[in-house]
Amino acid sequence: MGTTTLAWNINNTAENGSYTEMFSCITKFNTLNFLTVIIAVVGLAGNGIVLWLLAFHLHRNAFSVYVLNLAGADFLYLFTQVVHSLECVLQLDNNSFYILLIVTMFAYLAGLCMIAAISAERCLSVMWPIWYHCQRPRHTSAIMCALVWVSSLLLSLVVGLGCGFLFSYYDYYFCITLNFITAAFLIVLSVVLSVSSLALLVKIVWGSHRIPVTRFFVTIALTVVVFIYFGMPFGICWFLLSRIMEFDSIFFNNVYEIIEFLSCVNSCANPIIYFLVGSIRQHRLRWQSLKLLLQRAMQDTPEEESGERGPSQRSGELETV
């Protein structure tokens, strides 16, 4: 009798401990998803404002075209995260899970390409200014953005088809090959982003001809730093998905939720960066319109030089795409 009671107590304690641990995991999971929804909604509002201002209220230059498309990619990415997190928290039917997966991949790749393109083009404009201003085709930014959207969509659809996300067809080795191709694509973009940003920094800080730091340089630098710390882990985790799930799916789910939250912080941070950079060195304590702040963040002329120019001259600088 005593042995039976002891065994029952041990089993009961083990079950209670397992239940407590499971309840704790569910609570953390729901809390993280709830925070993701809050951050994503804030980011949707911020990127929506940037889209609205750049599309309809500001003249666009070569770089603001990329910023406009980056805001579009961030908006799409955050929207998918809101839908996915709400489905998890409310325990809704997730029949759309794989569709959201493809759209998330599409938006993430497009956003990374836009940031890499901004950094690379800014580096070219500083390293070889004469060639850049004289030889650069007029509609390069628009063409590059179109290519980015198309290539990101095609790559996402091919991965979705090959890995069984869209249809029942699934080829393990083909899926792994696609994952390696996509990972290589990410590595190339990351190298372009890192090298161009580092070269730009070296040129500005240690170059023989000192180049003044503009608001737009600060905007690019902060955007790149935030992406490396908050956005890059999502890409690393995403394309290790098949390998991680083979070893420990629980570990992957926990890590993935955290990284998903960080990537939402990255997409939410970009509009905040624009408006904060636009408000730097404003001595007059008065409310500045978001349009004016965003225009200042896109300003690629030194502070002293831009202060001497009239409004018509400054707006003229923003018309070349």
From Swiss-Prot:
Pfam families: 7tm_1 (PF00001)
GO molecular function, one term: G protein-coupled receptor activity
Membrane topology, from the record: Multi-pass membrane protein
Glycosylated residues, chain numbering: N11, N16, N94
UniProt keyword list: G-protein coupled receptor, Glycoprotein, Membrane, Receptor, Transducer, Transmembrane, Transmembrane helix
Extracellular side: 1-33, 84-97, 168-172, 237-257
GO cellular component terms given for this protein: membrane
Protein localization: Membrane
Assigned protein family: Belongs to the G-protein coupled receptor 1 family. Mas subfamily.
Name of the protein described by the UniProt record: Mas-related G-protein coupled receptor member B4
Organism: Mus musculus
Gene name linked to the record: Mrgprb4
